[in-house]
Amino acid sequence: MYKALFSRKTIDKIPEYYDCVHDLLNTSAVQELGEYTHHKGTTRLQHSLNVSYYNFLLCRKLHFDACSAARAGLLHDLFLYDRKQHEPVEGEGNHAVGHPKVAFFNAAEMFPINDREGDMIANHMWPLSPHMPHFRAVSYTHLTLPTILLV
């Protein structure tokens, strides 16, 4: 079973988190993220698990929608291609700006996501991307830099 970086427990041993994401976790689309390198030394699946788990913990502490944050964290990089070999589609812009839209469309097509989850996925690169999130959420896209977005 999977474990978030620095967590002492596997995620199946953390029922309040696991209950939020178990339906997504064993799908072929989420599993496929394990085939892509995210940054040096980690896969996109491990990165997404880290974002998901720590987003969940931080949102729970702040009394935000922790389940939606966990689900959005797991799906926020759901683009199924190698970003280093990907040719941007016209109008998509560079990868940093364009991939949230691709991840959102993939997530919305493959899974039942709510408005908050969709918003967090589509706008997780703000302020690099042009659209500001519509909901109060926590974006934990870098393990060392939680950014609280109060919208």
Language-model features: locations:
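Acidic/His-rich, divalent-metal-binding segments that scaffold phosphate/diphosphate chemistry
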Residues: 1-86, 90-92
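Histidine-centered active-site/metal-ligand motif
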Residues: 47, 76, 95, 99-100, ...
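An active-site-proximal "capping" alpha-helix that borders the catalytic cofactor pocket
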Residues: 52-54, 98-108
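Alpha-helical scaffolds flanking conserved acidic
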Residues: 64-75, 116-120, 134-140
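Short amphipathic alpha-helical segments at helix boundaries and their inter-helical linkers
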Residues: 78-88, 125-140
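Metalloprotease/metallohydrolase-associated module, dominated by Zn2+-dependent proteases
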Residues: 107, 112-136
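Conserved small/polar residues in nucleotide/adenosyl-binding loops
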Residues: 141-147
